[in-house]
């Protein structure tokens, strides 16, 4: 009974969690690898532009000096690829890492029925903070086998379906849980 979006507190399958963590780590490594390749290509393009400007200078150098210069540029390329990145690439890497951390953050949601609608077990679930409220309503419709569900935050208001659950949680949490009441018909207003 574990959906791709919601996890209950009682369902703690460590192999599933470790599998997800390994997927995230491998995805992180592949993104970093692609960014490093992109950075290396940019460095090569910059070096090619620098070599075309100083073409007359290289013609006057002896073959020994040219080979020493090529070796030193190769060594500096290897060092720059492994230790430092251009500022643009560094900012891209940091933004990708922030997005991955944001997607890993899960918030607790307490589900409370209103009226004659059945209660969902377990009552407390977790969902990714970056998900829209629509994902939660779809989960409830699927779990309760209903076409329409009306949801309310803290029995006070019905959020829009495109609102971010993480934002709702930070603004309206009670004891680190977002209380979502649900019913089959309009309950308030």
From Swiss-Prot:
Position of the Glycyl lysine isopeptide (Gly-Lys) (interchain with K-145 in ATG5) cross-link: 189
Molecular-function annotations in GO: Atg8-family ligase activity
Membrane topology: Peripheral membrane protein
GO cellular component term, pick one: Atg12-Atg5-Atg16 complex
Alphabetized SUPFAM superfamilies for the sequence: Ubiquitin-like (SSF54236)
Family: Belongs to the ATG12 family.
PANTHER family: AUTOPHAGY PROTEIN 12, UBIQUITIN-LIKE PROTEIN ATG12
Purpose: Ubiquitin-like protein involved in cytoplasm to vacuole transport (Cvt), autophagy vesicles formation, mitophagy, and nucleophagy. Conjugation with ATG5 through a ubiquitin-like conjugating system involving also ATG7 as an E1-like activating enzyme and ATG10 as an E2-like conjugating enzyme, is essential for its function. The ATG12-ATG5 conjugate functions as an E3-like enzyme which is required for lipidation of ATG8 and ATG8 association to the vesicle membranes.
Subunit structure as annotated in this protein's UniProt entry: Forms a conjugate with ATG5.
Name used for this protein in its record: Ubiquitin-like protein ATG12
Species assigned in the record: Kluyveromyces lactis (strain ATCC 8585 / CBS 2359 / DSM 70799 / NBRC 1267 / NRRL Y-1140 / WM37) (Yeast)
Gene name of the encoded protein: ATG12
